[in-house]
Each structure stands twice: as structure tokens, then as C-alpha cells.
Amino acid sequence: MQAAKTSHVRSVAAPLIMYGTAWKEDRTQALVLEAIAAGFRAFDTANQRKHYVEEEVGAAVRAAIASGTVTREDLFLQTKFTYQHGQDYRLPYDPDCDLTTQVRQSIASSLEHLGVTRIDSYILHGPSKSSGLGQADWQTWKTQSMEVWLACSELVTSLSTSSIPSSVVCG
């Protein structure tokens, strides 16, 4: 199976389909290896232990590379930053830090989990609160998202958002 790709923001070739790794728990590594054997080359995960076992995705990636099945360049790895309200008690960052520091800490943890030196796509997964957002909240988010991008641009090829209206991101 040849991975189909389409152009994406900032000339990053993004796959049309990714293998999602949520809710696989102790089967994550085996299922990711099966997906690689079946031809998948793009994987979506998150540094959100509540739903993902990012370390097992990394173990599968390392095993597939070590066996010669794929190279790092063959793979497209996408992971996410999830705000505290979407996490359980196993936070990959210090919740008392500012957003930029939280994202840096989460990226560092993801890089370690995945065993790679860069992430192809990094998603800021939703607004910081689940409800009751006003215009001031959106303005703060827009300002912080640029700070976050500047802080992580050397480790991340593409930064995206999820669950945020395009009118907020595009102005």
C-alpha cells in the first residue's frame, strides 16, 4: 500500500489517511507494527495517557526501523498537546507553568516516547477550557499559540489546531 499524500500548510506533505492509536492500550505496539506491515506510514498519537500509549507507538517505530522495514523518513508522526481538562492525573507537563512551557515539556516527553528527534505534525488539541469561552479567551489563545509555535518550531515540522474554529486561527 503506497501512502497517498496531499499538500499541506507550509509545504509539508501530509498523508490523506493516518493510523489512529487511541484506546489500543497494551496492544498498541503490536497493532502499530501490523499497520506498518500492511503499508501504513502515518500515525496519529498523543501525549495523553488517558487515551494513548505514546511510548508503545515509539517502541513499534523503533522496532520497524531496526528491522529495516522502514526508515524514519518513510514515516509521518503526528502527536498532540492536550490541555489539563482533557488529561487524567498523568500529565506530561507541569500544570503550574505557562502554556509555552507546558507545550515544550510535552514535546520533549513525546520526542522521548517516540524515540525521534522531530515530530512531523503537532496539534494543539482544542481550547484551554471546554466551555464558557469569551472573546478575551480567544485573543489570549491566538497570542499564546504564536508564542508556542515560535518555541517549538525547531522540533516540529507542522503545527496545527483541533476543535478551534478557523475564524479564530485565521483572524
Question: Which sequence ranges carry the predicted segments?
Answer:
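N-terminal binding-site loop/beta-alpha segment at the start of enzyme catalytic domains
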Residues: 1-79, 117
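Active-site beta-loop-alpha junctions enriched in small/polar residues
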Residues: 22-24, 48, 80-84, 124-127, ...
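Short catalytic/ligand-binding loop motif for oxyanion handling, primarily in non-cytosolic enzymes
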Residues: 27, 52-53, 85-87, 129-132, ...
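Short amphipathic alpha-helical "recognition" segments used for binding
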Residues: 38, 82-84, 146
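Hydrophobic positions in alpha-helices of CheY-like receiver
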Residues: 61, 81, 141-144
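Structural motif corresponding to the early beta-alpha repeats
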Residues: 68, 73-100, 125
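Glycine/proline-rich, positively charged
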Residues: 91-171
